[in-house]
């Protein structure tokens, strides 16, 4: 039962990050969430347009 809730929590977190990335568009380079002793960081690696 607990693993079911953990799976749902991970899916919701992934969808939230994906949605935020789509909304921010090209202006997003790094996204960091810090809560208590947990840090989640998403970094986009890309080559700038010339």
From Swiss-Prot:
Superkingdom of this protein's organism: Bacteria
GO cellular component, one term: plasma membrane
Entry-linked Pfam families: HOK_GEF
Membrane topology value: Single-pass membrane protein
Transmembrane feature ranges: 5-25
Keywords tagged on the record: Cell inner membrane, Cell membrane, Membrane, Toxin-antitoxin system, Transmembrane, Transmembrane helix
Compartments (UniProt record): Cell inner membrane
PROSITE patterns cross-referenced by the UniProt entry: HOK_GEF (PS00556)
Coarse class of the protein's main subcellular location: membrane
Family membership: Belongs to the Hok/Gef family.
Function: Toxic component of a type I toxin-antitoxin (TA) system. When overexpressed kills cells within minutes; causes collapse of the transmembrane potential and arrest of respiration. Its toxic effect is probably neutralized by an antisense antitoxin Sok RNA.
Name of this protein: Putative protein HokF
Organism whose genome encodes this protein: Shigella flexneri
């Amino acid at each position: 039962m607990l693993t079911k809730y953990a799976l749902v929590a991970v899916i919701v977190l992934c969808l939230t990050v994906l949605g935020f990335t789509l909304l921010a568009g090209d202006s997003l380079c790094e996204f960091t969430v810090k809560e208590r002793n947990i840090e989640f960081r998403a970094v986009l690696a890309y080559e700038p347009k010339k």
